[in-house]
Amino acid sequence: MRHANGRRGDTTIDIGKPVNFTGGLEFSNLTYTVIKKIKDSDGKWLNQEVDLLHQITGYAPKGCVTAVMGPSGAGKSTFLDGLAGRISSLRGRVSVDGMDMTPSFIKRTSAYIMQDDRLFPMLTVYETLLFAADLRLGPISMTDKRQRVEKLIEQLGLSSARNTYIGDEGTRGVSGGERRRVSIGVDIIHGPSLLFLDEPTSGLDSTSAHSVIDKVHAIARAGSTVILTIHQPSSRIQLLLDHLIILARGQLMYQGSPKDVSLHLGRMGRKVPKGESSIENLIDVIQEYDQSELGVEALAAFALTGMKPPPLGAHEMSIVPPSPAPSHREGRGHDRSNKRLHLKDQDFDHSLRSNWNTSKSWSASHSGVLQTLGFSPARHHRDHRNQNSVSSSLGDYAYTSENFRSIPTPHTQSSECTLNENDFMTPYAAANTNAYQYLGPKFANSFLSETWILMRRNFINIRRTPELFLSRLVVLTVMGIMMATMFMHPKKNLQGITNRLSFFIFTVCLFFFSSNDAVPAFIQERFIFVRETSHNKYRASSYTIAGLITYLPFLAVQAAVYAVIVWFALSLRGPFIYFLIVLYMSLLSTNSFVVFVSSVVPNYILGYAAVIAFTALFFLFCGYFLNSHDMPQYWKWMNYISTMTYPYEGLLMNQFQTSQTFGIDPLGRSITGNGILKSLNISQVESKKWEKVYIMLAWAIVYRILFYIVLRFFSKNQRT
């Protein structure tokens, strides 16, 4: 919707009001190539280029549900990622209503709903959608946001679960179907024009799956271009699909209305058995050809040119049982080991071409088609001159009426969507319009507004999961009492001084280890961050600052409780406020370090391993076992980067910067505090102890900056 001044207005999705739309998403010559390691007949490993997607051209109409289907390993999710801009090396052109898709354009106009519903378990359905509205809808009134959320809850059929927690393995919450609908609601609250869904019915029962697709169908009718991948949809779900794109081995097998699949099969000379789904029958036929000597190239040529593929023999047509068909990728190497290359990684088995696909019985008479479609598994040399880049090859492919007349799957006659041939004949000039200037700001809220919204959400999550904070507090309280009773009344000798040094180093280690439980908590939250920021929901900087500010008061409480317990019980000397600040800075720098490590590792097991390994190193080089002056020159740098060095030395300086006697040596000489520091090569100057605080603060800032850099530049849902 545009106002009179040309600016784009607020687009509200009302899925209860069907509207006819034209236009949509177009794509041409989409190709995605990866380098695979393969083993030749001599057992040697070779690098080979393999196309996971190969020259796919088509469209997804606006106001319709476009379903991407195909056998297992057909490239459905890869194709969806390519359309959604999640593959950086994709070649070809993708455009929406004639406007080329750029990363910035995709983030502002689309939403991508993953298979895994990454949501905060301790927020209710209403709160989850309201926070999404806060972050997506910008500075509109809270009343309008609440009305939008209430309307969306009703439209998604979530009224009965409005005040129910999302839940997880440990907390009972909404059902799987309701959870999936909440995920959809989070991403459509701002009315995206493009909606991508990866297997939205995965893991759901038939009733829940139908409910989800029914809501998605209503969203499409409200004006969005909806593209989803789906595997073996039920007959009820098939009635809700408006447009099909069927793939096999990364090539286009069929495109058009589901109602025209039987016509497509009839033109191939195949009849759909009575009572059987035409879509499932087509997928069975695809698998039969894939297992035959002809391969799926024959069907790809038929989809492109209408050239009827040769019929299969009776023994070849019996390869695939009636649907639902199992994945034919499993165990193929056993039957065809002498004719196939052996992959090092079977995950990409679907991308390799059958070496029967170039059989002389078909390719000799259709060499022109194979030249258009083709590639072979042993293709080591590629002509890159004909490969397109999403950003640079805008005019290499042009839709014409002849192209659409030649496609043997008519869609405009039987599809319920309002389609027009001219909707898919977008000239190259259309991509050069000035429509980009009407996309609006990159983010809906200011930096400060985002930070405040994220802080409120963090506080709610902490308040409803108090065990994380309370567990740390209980540990520090119990350990404080134990330390106070164990090290009370130290003796006035060398052993008493050693005991006091042991108390300080154990305190530092205790505070370091108490932050380790942040590893799984953040790793779980990181997936939500990646989902939310992939489409400009908020800035990585605001997320970093909000997380820091949220934990500051909780860290202060932990430090204060421990400090009060041990300070008075052990009659420690020096300013109490300095003792408290050192403990607080130690917690802050350690927490920042643990959060940074958690942002780098892929899972909490490696996270724990990394944190424990660094803890051991920092402990070894902190100066307790060997002071910095006695360390080998090539290891001194470890003393400087150890986050245990500075709180340990700061606590010692606060305790021993005095001429007071702390013990008597074996020769009967007095041991003063300054003498203890001198023996440890620690400064006896009073003002120097504040440098330790500044250094700890600097390390906390450095680790937070590194944390931000990882989030900003390396935490992206994108393939190379």
UniProtKB/Swiss-Prot annotation:
<keyword id="KW-0812">Transmembrane</keyword>
<keyword id="KW-1278">Translocase</keyword>
<dbReference type="GO" id="GO:0009610">
    <property type="term" value="P:response to symbiotic fungus"/>
</dbReference>
<dbReference type="GO" id="GO:0005524">
    <property type="term" value="F:ATP binding"/>
</dbReference>
<keyword id="KW-0325">Glycoprotein</keyword>
<dbReference type="GO" id="GO:0140359">
    <property type="term" value="F:ABC-type transporter activity"/>
</dbReference>
<feature type="glycosylation site" description="N-linked (GlcNAc...) asparagine">
    <location>
        <position position="681"/>
    </location>
</feature>
<keyword id="KW-0472">Membrane</keyword>
<dbReference type="InterPro" id="IPR027417">
    <property type="entry name" value="P-loop_NTPase"/>
</dbReference>
<feature type="topological domain" description="Cytoplasmic">
    <location>
        <begin position="715"/>
        <end position="720"/>
    </location>
</feature>
<dbReference type="Pfam" id="PF00005">
    <property type="entry name" value="ABC_tran"/>
</dbReference>
<comment type="subunit">
    <text>Heterodimerizes with STR; the resulting transporter is located in the peri-arbuscular membrane.</text>
</comment>
<feature type="topological domain" description="Cytoplasmic">
    <location>
        <begin position="597"/>
        <end position="604"/>
    </location>
</feature>
<dbReference type="Pfam" id="PF01061">
    <property type="entry name" value="ABC2_membrane"/>
</dbReference>
<feature type="compositionally biased region" description="Basic and acidic residues">
    <location>
        <begin position="327"/>
        <end position="346"/>
    </location>
</feature>
<keyword id="KW-0378">Hydrolase</keyword>
<dbReference type="InterPro" id="IPR017871">
    <property type="entry name" value="ABC_transporter-like_CS"/>
</dbReference>
<feature type="transmembrane region" description="Helical; Name=2">
    <location>
        <begin position="503"/>
        <end position="523"/>
    </location>
</feature>
<feature type="transmembrane region" description="Helical; Name=5">
    <location>
        <begin position="605"/>
        <end position="625"/>
    </location>
</feature>
<dbReference type="GO" id="GO:0005886">
    <property type="term" value="C:plasma membrane"/>
</dbReference>
<dbReference type="InterPro" id="IPR003439">
    <property type="entry name" value="ABC_transporter-like_ATP-bd"/>
</dbReference>
<feature type="topological domain" description="Cytoplasmic">
    <location>
        <begin position="1"/>
        <end position="467"/>
    </location>
</feature>
<comment type="similarity">
    <text>Belongs to the ABC transporter superfamily. ABCG family. Stunted arbuscule (STR) subfamily.</text>
</comment>
<feature type="binding site">
    <location>
        <begin position="70"/>
        <end position="77"/>
    </location>
    <ligand>
        <name>ATP</name>
    </ligand>
</feature>
<feature type="topological domain" description="Extracellular">
    <location>
        <begin position="626"/>
        <end position="693"/>
    </location>
</feature>
<feature type="topological domain" description="Cytoplasmic">
    <location>
        <begin position="524"/>
        <end position="547"/>
    </location>
</feature>
<dbReference type="InterPro" id="IPR013525">
    <property type="entry name" value="ABC2_TM"/>
</dbReference>
<comment type="function">
    <text>Together with STR, required for arbuscule development in arbuscular mycorrhizal (AM) symbiosis.</text>
</comment>
<keyword id="KW-1003">Cell membrane</keyword>
<keyword id="KW-1133">Transmembrane helix</keyword>
<feature type="region of interest" description="Disordered">
    <location>
        <begin position="313"/>
        <end position="346"/>
    </location>
</feature>
<feature type="topological domain" description="Extracellular">
    <location>
        <begin position="569"/>
        <end position="575"/>
    </location>
</feature>
<feature type="domain" description="ABC transporter">
    <location>
        <begin position="25"/>
        <end position="274"/>
    </location>
</feature>
<feature type="transmembrane region" description="Helical; Name=3">
    <location>
        <begin position="548"/>
        <end position="568"/>
    </location>
</feature>
<keyword id="KW-0547">Nucleotide-binding</keyword>
<feature type="topological domain" description="Extracellular">
    <location>
        <begin position="489"/>
        <end position="502"/>
    </location>
</feature>
<feature type="transmembrane region" description="Helical; Name=6">
    <location>
        <begin position="694"/>
        <end position="714"/>
    </location>
</feature>
<feature type="transmembrane region" description="Helical; Name=1">
    <location>
        <begin position="468"/>
        <end position="488"/>
    </location>
</feature>
<feature type="transmembrane region" description="Helical; Name=4">
    <location>
        <begin position="576"/>
        <end position="596"/>
    </location>
</feature>
<keyword id="KW-0067">ATP-binding</keyword>
<keyword id="KW-0813">Transport</keyword>
<dbReference type="InterPro" id="IPR003593">
    <property type="entry name" value="AAA+_ATPase"/>
</dbReference>
